[in-house]
């Protein structure tokens, strides 16, 4: 037995020896240790409070008369304007930015990912005829950086304001040990409204309807895991490296902001010129277009009827990616498809031309299998 068993412990730390009939337990003596705080565990509440103060001002810029209360309540309050809709249907969607964030981390470019998220969510409900009402975000990180958080939320707020949507709340989570240093995840939730008799569901789509495609700005928010593998692993590019094949830097090509189609969608819907619309996201045209097609109808898409962006051509060449894989992974330069009854096509064309909205006739709705055929 040591001379002073009460002072012997692991790693030289003092312990108390508690004797029992069958065994002796060594209990750490914490009387001399300092108090451990939440900040010691990696969660700095004061830093979080500073970030919230920065965020509050940005969010308030998006408020309208229907937002009740401010940022900081347990729940965000929004008044549904019953004079605006006779028989309102709420339409909601939730999404994230995906591994596009990895490029944002490397480039230190955080403002645009906020816009990516809002525009993606706006498009998802707008294709059903809904007007965006309010948006909430979720940002999680290992160690909170108030400046980065402000940059992200600034992008969210700017996009919300541009889409007529109020940023009424959200969650900023500090999760030490869960995320790598300097990284975060970002997700959003949107709610919009549409009168029941104005919903756009695709139920009215018929064989013979013309399919028009509206151009995308790039990958938008989908296919980034494959794109990153091809550009950064296979080709060995750096995000800041100029790539001759696409005539711009690799990172710049990948960080182009997800386009909002709200304005053009509202024009088509208000004029009663579309029977259904598809937001082309993960799964490409192959997976997304059938989501709006009625039973016993399919889509015939004419490849080559729209210009494929250089970034997609280069990705295909780098990985010898099959056409089938490309079409079900990327938007290939088409971010939105609208079905237009043949009898209304001229009116739709004139409307889009007046609005200076570029579009391409990319195919037709056909009778038959519920799938996309490429010709």
Predicted regions and their residues:
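Short hydrophobic transmembrane-like helices used for membrane targeting/insertion
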Residues: 1, 8, 18, 26-30
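Short hydrophobic alpha-helical segments enriched in small aliphatic residues
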Residues: 12-16, 21
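Glycine-/charge-enriched secondary-structure boundary and capping motifs
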Residues: 26-40, 57, 148-166, 179-186, ...
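Short, acidic Gly/Pro/Ser/Thr-rich loop/turn segments
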Residues: 48, 84-85, 97-100, 195-198, ...
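Glycine-rich phosphate/pyrophosphate-binding loop regions near the starts of catalytic domains
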Residues: 57-217
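Mobile "lid/hinge" segments at catalytic clefts and subdomain interfaces of large enzymes
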Residues: 205-233, 237
């Amino acid at each position: 037995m040591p001379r002073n068993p009460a002072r012997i412990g692991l790693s030289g730390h003092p312990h108390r020896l508690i004797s029992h009939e069958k065994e002796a337990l060594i209990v750490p003596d914490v009387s001399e240790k300092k108090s451990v705080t939440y900040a010691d565990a990696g969660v700095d509440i004061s830093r979080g409070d500073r970030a919230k103060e920065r965020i509050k001002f940005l969010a308030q810029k998006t408020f309208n008369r229907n937002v009740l209360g401010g940022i900081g309540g347990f729940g965000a309050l929004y008044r549904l304007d019953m004079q605006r809709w006779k028989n309102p249907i709420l339409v909601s969607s939730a999404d994230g930015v995906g591994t596009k964030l990895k490029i944002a981390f490397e480039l230190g470019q955080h403002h645009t990912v906020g816009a990516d998220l809002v525009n993606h969510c706006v498009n998802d409900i707008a294709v059903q005829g809904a007007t965006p009402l309010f948006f909430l975000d979720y940002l999680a990180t290992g160690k909170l950086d108030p400046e980065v958080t402000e940059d992200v939320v600034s992008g969210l707020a700017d996009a919300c304001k541009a889409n007529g949507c109020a940023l009424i709340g959200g969650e900023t989570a500090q999760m030490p040990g869960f995320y790598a240093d300097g990284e975060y995840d970002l997700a959003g939730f949107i709610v919009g409204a549409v009168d029941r008799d104005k919903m756009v569901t695709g139920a009215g789509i018929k064989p013979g309807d013309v399919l028009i495609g509206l151009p995308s700005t790039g990958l938008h928010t989908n296919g980034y895991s494959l794109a990153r593998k091809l550009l950064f692993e296979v080709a060995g590019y750096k995000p800041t490296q100029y790539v001759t094949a696409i005539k711009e830097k690799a990172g710049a090509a990948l960080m182009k902001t997800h386009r909002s189609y709200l304005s053009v969608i509202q024009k088509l819907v208000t004029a009663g010129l579309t029977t259904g619309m598809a937001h082309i996201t993960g799964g490409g045209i192959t997976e997304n277009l059938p989501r709006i097609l009625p039973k016993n109808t399919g889509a015939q898409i004419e490849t080559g009827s729209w210009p494929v962006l250089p970034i997609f051509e280069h990705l295909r060449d780098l990985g010898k990616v099959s056409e089938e894989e490309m079409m079900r992974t990327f938007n290939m330069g088409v971010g939105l498809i609208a079905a237009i009854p043949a009898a209304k096509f001229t009116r739709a064309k004139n409307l889009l031309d007046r609005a200076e909205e570029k579009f391409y006739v990319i195919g037709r709705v056909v009778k038959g299998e519920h799938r996309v055929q490429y010709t």
